[in-house]
Design a protein with these regions (language model features):
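Membrane-interface junctions at transmembrane-helix termini in multi-pass inner-membrane proteins
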Residues: 2-5, 135-162, 183, 204, ...
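Interhelical loop/hinge segments that connect adjacent transmembrane helices in multipass membrane
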Residues: 2, 182-186, 200-243, 286, ...
Length: 479
């Protein structure tokens, strides 16, 4: 069962990545690059409003993993917890839908910069439907988290994959065969999220409460879990603000079409972090066990070995995308204009994301020791640097300014953070880690890919699939 859960977890993550890169070019092709900016803004808004979760999903998953019982009648506490959180989320969702509905005209007319050929009334209606879609997706995340920690990971990932297929294929079908309208896209998202929320909620309740025992709202449940949920909410607030500030400010300061280019560049730049998180899923449990056993020798060996493998994979992917950014963007979107506009932004965003990906190993080392305060402190410092930097660089340099700010902030803060954590817990191998796991892979991979780029010239006259194959061969050869 454990192996099956791991396989379906990987399938779920793989599908999320694959679907993103498959469907985005279709949306760009059907709707146009400027209208795609509304989808990019919807994604940003969804992540920002996830703060309204208030740490409830993290708290539910922790409580389920701690208290779930296979015995009949043994889950009364969890049923009351789920009912309490569910009713609280109902209030949160209604509030989100109401607020987005009211402020939609302000978003369209005062925040986003639409061109003259876009109908503001259609965009306002679309934003309102997307607000309803968000209102149902957030509680669905709560129910998904509950299923994952009940070890119903196969079912949870199947439901999530089917939901992803439904919301994307339904939108593509309606846009292609009926009417090319951002309103139609928004309605498809709303209906798909509503169905997914209702189905995954029903499945979670059946799993926790097969005997259909009546659960009730309990105030004491909130009182007993508020400290943990508040702490998680604060970490979430910092993380969300840090991750979305650049997109939010770009959407405010630049035309919608420019924001579309930035959104596409951001999508490409997340790949190194996804690669790193796959390593993190495997490494963190072993870190935690070795820290608990105070086995410093094996912890050091695992940190160096894992760090080297992570750097090898992350840097190969990152530097390949940097060297072939224009080629990759053209092969992905089929647009030479997108490739020209977004290539430099991709490179700068990749620098920042690569630094964060390489920091994942020290980050998990700190978590294994229960050392989380430094992450909060560095998050706050990052915001203090990033926010003013974004306003200055975007106003001065335009689209590329967002990438400059992101790269500089991570270069300053992330570098300091990882050195501090490694020095605190594994000081004896700090220099060796920097040389073996960072500098050596960075230099060797850069040289290899530079040589491969010289001997394998890829131009935009190639077919899209041929470009993908050439980039893939170059990256694989480096490994």
């Amino acid at each position: 069962m454990l192996k099956l859960n791991i396989i379906f977890n990987l399938l779920g993550k793989s599908w999320a990545l694959i679907s993103t890169f498959v469907f985005i070019p279709l949306y760009v092709h059907i709707l146009g690059i400027e209208m795609y900016g509304i989808i990019g803004f919807y994604t940003t808004l969804l992540v920002i409003l996830a703060f309204a979760d208030l740490g409830l999903t993290a708290t539910l998953t922790r409580e389920v993993s701690r208290n779930y019982s296979h015995q009949k009648g043994g889950n009364t506490y969890l049923m009351d917890l789920l009912k309490t959180y569910e009713l609280l989320y109902l209030f949160i969702s209604i509030t989100i839908a109401f607020i987005v509905y009211i402020v939609a005209p302000l978003i369209v007319n005062r925040w986003l910069h639409l061109s003259s050929n876009m109908n503001p009334e259609d965009v306002i209606l679309a934003v309102r439907y997307l607000g309803f879609a968000i209102a149902f997706q957030l509680p669905a995340n709560l129910f998904y988290g509950g299923l994952m920690w009940l070890e119903k990971q196969v079912s949870a990932n199947i439901l999530q994959i089917l939901w992803g297929i439904l919301r994307n294929l339904s939108a593509i079908f309606v846009l292609y065969y009926f009417s090319v309208s951002i309103v139609n896209f928004a309605i498809c998202q709303f209906v798909s999220n509503l169905l997914y929320c209702l189905i995954i909620r029903s499945y979670l309740w059946i799993s926790i409460n097969p005997d259909r025992v009546k659960a009730a709202f309990k105030k004491n449940v909130l009182l007993s879990t508020w400290r943990y949920s508040t702490g998680m909410a604060m970490m979430s607030l910092i993380s969300i603000t840090l991750g979305q500030a650049d997109k939010l400010i770009v959407s405010k300061l630049l035309p919608l079409k420019e924001f579309s280019y930035y959104s596409l560049a951001s999508t490409v730049s997340i790949v190194p972090m996804i690669v790193a998180e796959i390593f993190g899923m495997a490494i963190f449990p072993r870190f935690a066990r070795l820290v608990k056993e105070n086995d410093i020798d094996n912890l050091s060996k695992l940190f160096l070995k894992g760090g080297y493998l992570l750097s090898l994979c992350v840097l190969t992917v990152s530097i390949s995308l940097m060297f072939f950014s224009r080629n990759f963007l053209f092969a992905w979107t089929g647009s030479s204009v997108v490739a020209a506009k977004a290539q430099n932004v991709v490179i700068l965003l990749l620098i920042g994301q690569t630094l964060q990906a390489l920091a994942l190993m020290p980050y998990y080392l700190g978590l294994a020791h229960g050392y989380v305060r430094i992450n909060l402190q560095m998050g706050v410092i990052s915001l203090l640097i990033l926010l003013p930097c974004l306003f200055l660089t975007i106003n001065k340099f335009g689209l590329i300014g967002g990438g400059i700010s992101w790269a500089l902030t991570n270069l300053l803060v992330t570098t300091f953070l990882v050195v501090k954590i490694v020095k605190r817990f594994l000081s004896s191998i700090l220099l060796r880690w920097i040389l073996q796991c960072i500098l050596f892979p960075l230099i060797s991979i850069t040289i290899c890919l530079w040589v491969l780029k010289l001997i394998t010239p890829i131009n935009l006259m190639f077919s899209q699939w041929r470009i993908f194959v050439c980039i893939g061969i170059s990256a694989t050869t480096t490994l």
